Amino acid sequence: MGAGGRRMPVPPARLLLLPLLPCLLLLAPGTRGAPGCPVPIRGCKCSGERPKGLSGGAHNPARRRVVCGGGDLPEPPDPGLLPNGTITLLLSNNKITGLRNGSFLGLSLLEKLDLRSNVISTVQPGAFLGLGELKRLDLSNNRIGCLTSETFQGLPRLLRLNISGNIYSSLQPGVFDELPALKIVDFGTEFLTCDCRLRWLLPWARNHSLQLSERTLCAYPSALHAHALSSLQESQLRCEGALELHTHYLIPSLRQVVFQGDRLPFQCSASYLGNDTRIHWYHNGAPMESDEQAGIVLAENLIHDCTFITSELTLSHIGVWASGEWECSVSTVQGNTSKKVEIVVLETSASYCPAERVTNNRGDFRWPRTLAGITAYQSCLQYPFTSVPLSGGAPGTRASRRCDRAGRWEPGDYSHCLYTNDITRVLYTFVLMPINASNALTLAHQLRVYTAEAASFSDMMDVVYVAQMIQKFLGYVDQIKELVEVMVDMASNLMLVDEHLLWLAQREDKACSGIVGALERIGGAALSPHAQHISVNSRNVALEAYLIKPHSYVGLTCTAFQRREVGVSGAQPSSVGQDAPVEPEPLADQQLRFRCTTGRPNISLSSFHIKNSVALASIQLPPSLFSTLPAALAPPVPPDCTLQLLVFRNGRLFRSHGNNTSRPGAAGPGKRRGVATPVIFAGTSGCGVGNLTEPVAVSLRHWAEGADPMAAWWNQDGPGGWSSEGCRLRYSQPNVSSLYCQHLGNVAVLMELNAFPREAGGSGAGLHPVVYPCTALLLLCLFSTIITYILNHSSIHVSRKGWHMLLNLCFHMAMTSAVFVGGVTLTNYQMVCQAVGITLHYSSLSSLLWMGVKARVLHKELSWRAPPLEEGEAAPPGPRPMLRFYLIAGGIPLIICGITAAVNIHNYRDHSPYCWLVWRPSLGAFYIPVALILPITWIYFLCAGLHLRSHVAQNPKQGNRISLEPGEELRGSTRLRSSGVLLNDSGSLLATVSAGVGTPAPPEDGDGVYSPGVQLGALMTTHFLYLAMWACGALAVSQRWLPRVVCSCLYGVAASALGLFVFTHHCARRRDVRASWRACCPPASPSASHVPARALPTATEDGSPVLGEGPASLKSSPSGSSGRAPPPPCKLTNLQVAQSQVCEASVAARGDGEPEPTGSRGSLAPRHHNNLHHGRRVHKSRAKGHRAGETGGKSRLKALRAGTSPGAPELLSSESGSLHNSPSDSYPGSSRNSPGDGLPLEGEPMLTPSEGSDTSAAPIAETGRPGQRRSASRDNLKGSGSALERESKRRSYPLNTTSLNGAPKGGKYEDASVTGAEAIAGGSMKTGLWKSETTV
């Protein structure tokens, strides 16, 4: 550039080389590396470093950057080997273990030192001397545990410090005092404990403008975990609560099984929190010290890196004594914590404890076979849906049980497990809850709700926990007066608990004594000048308390009474306590009350002046009660004193936890001395009462019978018990005892009891006397009916289905009544009472279901419609099994009872005076099922009645024949309606009297005696009588005296009416039953064997009966003598006989299946047949009908021809040649009836064979051949159609009779017996000559 300011142009190529100039200088041979960077340091690189604040230009040759990272340096490099101008020294990711004093002396220009990610554990004081220009120091991710103020000496200009990731848990105060320029620090670690030891740091940081890094997070305690230290307040940094150590372990940590003579070392390490941290060793709770002779070597505590403390214990020669728990305990000023390990020392011959199952209130535990000396563990049963978040039920808790050296199980420890009973778990929750004045009343009301069901308590801990809560509430009575009433109610409810549970609770925790003691102290705690009187009433406890002045006291008489039961105005006082039932929630008028008057009036328990009330106990306190005050307690002005009275209905709460007579049954088998009267208490508080100059007079009413009465007072010293010292009996009557006592306290009369004391109307009390004879009559009638129908099964004309239903119904009604009378009051025995409740539950439901099933079957029969049978159509389906009825009427109650008992067997014992379901479970297990069964049954009754009514409306002429008297059968036009088909489509005669009117009988076996209307009326009567009996019986055991008597009488009426009706209807009024009874009696004379014959329904091939003469006796003479029978009293035409045959057609062959719906309505006439119980065999024979049809048809044609021939007297046929029923085709069972079958039914005339009649009661020739029991072929049907039509037009025919066995001709009866030889030879019957008679 010249003087004129000219500028030389720069070539473009030079401009491109300017940016590359620094790189070229570094790559030049003379400039690579910095001069003075020594070669001997392996892994170190040196480079120039641009000063901060310079954006361009060359590096300052005096500033050096040395990088020695990622190598294996065991210590920092010698500063003498580093360049003098080293500004940055990076030593990260090496293996440096410590920093010695003056490790960096000489690097005075060093500004940044990076020592992160090494294994530095010690930093000696003065390690950073000579680094006066150092501004950034990084010691993170090392193993530094000790940091003091000397550690950072020589760093006056340090601005940023990072010591995070080390192993220290706290910082000592003043550790940063040598860093005056420090602005940012990061010291977060995984062990950092933010407690009172770091409280100094927050104000120090504020005063020195120190910024704590946001990455400095607390690790302990757990409440401050992951919280930034900079965001905490000083008040949050405190050393309170449980001690939490970041490190605490014991080696070995698991149970060790060793042998005698082995060597076993222990090592315990924990966090070191300061000079007060110590480690101690314990064996089975006993402190251990070093003892070389015993083989115990205990080393001194060692401290590592100011962070850990370690102690070692060595057992050099293990003996049996070393078995048990070894404990390492860490003690600090803040608290103690410990770790345990179990050691089991085995002997040379070790035994085993056997496998065992233990069931208790904590669950079901199965302990396996365990080696002797070993402690076994079982996981507790957890309840994931429980609402009790208790530490004892936390997941992972276990029960433990030790097997001792002898191979015997020790008692287990189940305290960490939850209770299995819901009520016990809830009561345990109440015990754990903190109580204060703000929530005491609320908790008391909630607890009272649970004690209302105290009668169902099943665990002694229920009583223990309630007693503990009552004692806790006592401390708040002076602030909350309402607690008095709640506490008395809870104590009253607990008196309903089972006596054995009360005794167990007393033995476990003196629970009963605690309850009584709390009640005795209520008056002194609750009374004040503002509340000078308290009166509380409850079912079993009454309390009265007064605040009185001793100088104005003139005596006090108090009487405990209760309202007389409704309707017992004339009852004797002795009945009180015996008739009143134990009720969990009694009525208000049955509560105990006090009535007190001043002075000493003469009050008698027998003549209590309050209307409709009964006095139970009275006490008279003498006027000199306070005259014996000690001089120290007699100030010039007499103080106020508390006088309190209590009365307990019985002595249930007075239990001794010792082994004396207070335990049930301890005095001998069946007898013991127990409390036989109420217990009354009188006591003072706030003023001392010395020896009484006058005794206290007490009168008590007996509620239990016994002998040898004794006056006693309750002594709470020691185990507690009744003592007669100071009390004497004045007199004792059967109902009332009077006594004197020199003590203030609980007083009662003890007696030798013949049974355990029980509450009024208690367990085991009998029913009203009228119940027993009426129930006996009912059982006699029911079992007579059952036995009759079982022994005469084949001779009673009822269907198979009806037979099963009747027997089951009678049996279950008998079971209900018998169990009710015999066991409903047996509440003394828990298992028996539960069995009675289950049986009553089952039998009651089953009886109702059998009635419903019977109503359904009757409705099906009435609504049955006959199916139209086309030619070639298959026969109706076979009978359905009876098992379905048993599954409904017996299976459903069994399932309900099984589920109810499986859920909780105590659902069948409510501590009520009767054995039945608890109220709440009974709603779903009994009353709801009954509410479903009854409407369904009544609907079936209604539908059946409507079908009967519609039939009467459609057939007004037969309306008066629907409901018949017993033994009466439908005849006339009713027979015409059911006489449509005489023979079925397998080849039998289809003799149709009136086409379009006749329909076949329904495929159900009906009653051969009663019409459907009569059956329906009988079933409804039985149903409602049973309901009335059940309801009256239930009221008879649950009501009070007068309603109980009324209901007992009504029960007796209903039971007697039910039994008599069932027996009369099903046995006494049936001719077939009466005939079977007469058959059981021997004949009075030889002539008694000749019984008049009657027309019997004999089965055809298709199961339809026709009228024929029944055998007079099965013992008729086998000879073939001819005789003439006397003429019958009336004559019947063949048409009438045919009509009678069809009307009484049997439906046994149709089976027992349910009726199928069809298009036409069936006949309502009763269907009479000879042996309805063989219908299954007849039904099976249908399958062979086609194979034997031809043979059967030919035999019938022969019979027709022979019947018209005068030379064929052996065959019976009509004059027109029609064949009603061949003898060979009659059902074989028709000849096997009892003699009673030969009698005519009630209301039915005796019939004899008409001309052309082929009916016979003789057995067929070949009863075993199915071909002989088949219908005629359809060819035979065509051949005999015209003859049948002519026969139907006849009005009457003469009936020829024959005398058998020499009987005079023209007699009134005939003997139609045929010998078996004749039946086998000819298969026909003998008959007389035909007589002609005018025909219209």
Curated annotation (Swiss-Prot):
GO terms, biological process: angiogenesis; canonical Wnt signaling pathway; central nervous system development; endothelial cell migration; negative regulation of vascular endothelial growth factor signaling pathway; positive regulation of canonical Wnt signaling pathway; positive regulation of endothelial cell migration; regulation of angiogenesis
Tissue expression summary: Abundantly expressed in the vasculature of the developing embryo. Expression in normal adult tissues is specifically vascular with endothelial expression in CNS, including brain and retina and more widespread pericyte expression in the brain and organs, including the kidney, pancreas and corpus luteum.
Annotated positions for site Cleavage: R369, T370, R398, A399
Bias type Low complexity, positions: 1084-1095, 1110-1124
Residue ranges, annotated region (GPS): 711-757
Extracellular side: 34-769, 827-830, 906-922, 1038-1044
Phenotype of the disrupted gene, per the record: No viable adults. Beginning at 11 dpc, deficient embryos exhibit completely penetrant, progressive CNS hemorrhage originating in forebrain telencephalon and ventral neural tube leading to embryonic lethality from 15.5 dpc. Embryos at 11.5 dpc display selective CNS-specific vascular patterning defects, with markedly reduced angiogenic sprouting into the forebrain telencephalon and thickening of the underlying periventricular vascular plexus rendering the telencephalon virtually avascular. Remaining CNS vessels show significantly increased permeability. Lung size is reduced in 15.5 dpc embryos.
Residue spans, topological domain Cytoplasmic: 791-805, 852-884, 944-1016, 1066-1336
Biased composition (Basic residues): 1166-1186
Domain Ig-like intervals: 247-344
Glycosites: N84, N101, N162, N275, N602, N691, N735
Top-level taxon of origin: Eukaryota
Modification after translation, per record: Glycosylated.
Domain LRRCT: 190-241
Keywords: Angiogenesis, Cell membrane, Cell projection, Disulfide bond, G-protein coupled receptor, Glycoprotein, Immunoglobulin domain, Leucine-rich repeat, Membrane, Phosphoprotein, Receptor, Repeat, Signal, Transducer, Transmembrane, Transmembrane helix, Wnt signaling pathway
Spans traversing the lipid bilayer: 770-790, 806-826, 831-851, 885-905, 923-943, 1017-1037, 1045-1065
Consequence of substituting D364E: No effect on potentiation of WNT7A signaling
Domain GAIN-B: 594-757
Zinc in keyword set: no
Residue ranges of the motif RGD: 362-364
Gene Ontology terms: cellular component: cell surface; filopodium; intracellular membrane-bounded organelle; plasma membrane; Wnt signalosome
The LRR repeat ranges on this chain: 85-106, 109-130, 133-154, 157-178
PANTHER family, sorted: ADHESION G PROTEIN-COUPLED RECEPTOR A2, G-PROTEIN COUPLED RECEPTOR 124-LIKE PROTEIN
UniProt note: domains: The leucine-rich repeats (LRRs) are important for potentiation of Wnt7 signaling.
Described purpose of this protein according to its UniProt entry: Endothelial receptor which functions together with RECK to enable brain endothelial cells to selectively respond to Wnt7 signals (WNT7A or WNT7B). Plays a key role in Wnt7-specific responses, such as endothelial cell sprouting and migration in the forebrain and neural tube, and establishment of the blood-brain barrier. Acts as a Wnt7-specific coactivator of canonical Wnt signaling: required to deliver RECK-bound Wnt7 to frizzled by assembling a higher-order RECK-ADGRA2-Fzd-LRP5-LRP6 complex.
Protein name: Adhesion G protein-coupled receptor A2
